[in-house]
Amino acid sequence: MSNLATVIAIVPRLPPAIDGVGDYALNLARQLRKDFNIQTHFIVGNSTWQGAAEIEGFTISQITDNSANILVNVLSNYHSSSPVLLHYVGYGYAKRGCPVWLVDGLQRWKGLYPKSNLVTMFHEISASGPPWTSAFWLSSLQKDLAAQLTKLSDRCITSKQLYANIITEISQGKHNQVAFLPVFSNIGEPDQLPSDLSERQQRLVIFGGVANRARVYNQSQRILDYVCQRLNIQEICDIGTPTGITPSFIGKVPILEIGEQPANKVSDILANSIAGFSDYNPDFLAKSTIFAAYCAYRLLPINAKGSVAIIDGIEAGKHYWVPDINRNDLGDQFNWQTIADNSFDWYQKHNLSRQSSIFVSYLLHGDLN
């Protein structure tokens, strides 16, 4: 039990908006309340968000105009001993990914309350893209804002080792040890699962946002067909906002397109399926809540692409299967149960309960000085 009463969490958006960072923040708030009796008050920083004044017993304030003054005023309503947890992703707080108002407001607040404790979870550092996109030209400003944030923050956390290294560099010596915590499942973590995949339905799940699932159908149908044949898949379950291009079959295997579903329904489906498929940049799997869900539910995670390096503790062939349609790679050496077990064990090292403990230690950091 903690004597810390309230955390002020700044987020871009919360449900009912579909927002991965908002889901992450809400799941973390639930766990902080469950494990440590810590209450969270949310400040929604996206002025276009539409939602209620509270969610699941957590109160919500909203920045109705992207103004540093308004942010300072809202933060000043709370006792300066209440730590602030910023969930940072530039595009969440400004259209072009450069929330100058947010950084300016936090700087002013820190000037007024120098002993206050600011912990920043960097979900992103800066965007990048081709030279004809605004992200390319604005990435310098985005990095400058991120650097300012690292210097304002008492502690920093992020989801990738690469990001942790960047934070160490741009903070110019302030943060020499930055925790990196791969994201947790936004669909919860099951209390019990069948001990063996053979006890589950021969079902494969394709889950996530429209863009990620559309990429599977646009680029990976041959691989998916190969997977279905090799694993004797009887049904593919497509979960999420309809893509508009989802086929009815992959080979002879029917696709059941069930649309958006509540978390408890998705949880039931994952717990009784054998595999989860994605076509994701393998260097960024630690940031994928979908990959996290596949691992948490002890499915066989399958990704259309693999990385030759071990990144964030994730190794192709050990923690996920990368099918090779040019050869039968389900010989004697292939054990899907072992890969499922390895991915599950990797996930448990940073599951939601463990992460909440780390966040609490950082949020309490100011009280320990």
Label every model-predicted segment.
Residues L270-L285, L299:
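Acidic donor-binding loop of glycosyltransferase active sites
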Residues R327-L368:
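A charged, aromatic-enriched C-terminal amphipathic alpha-helix characteristic of glycosyltransferases
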Residues T241-P242, I255-A271, K287:
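Conserved active-site histidine-acidic residue motif and adjacent donor-binding/catalytic loop
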Residues V11-I18, R30-S80, T241-I245, T289:
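N-terminal strand-loop element at the rim of the active site
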Residues N186-S248, A263:
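Conserved catalytic-core segment of nucleotide-activated headgroup transferases in glycan assembly
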Residues Q107-L112, F136-C156:
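Membrane-proximal helix-turn-helix segments that form the acceptor-binding/catalytic region
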Residues K151-E199, R203-G208:
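Donor nucleotide-sugar binding/catalytic pocket of nucleotide-sugar-dependent glycosyltransferases
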Residues V119, A127-Q148, I187-E189:
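Nucleotide-sugar donor phosphate/pyrophosphate-binding loop at the beta->alpha transition
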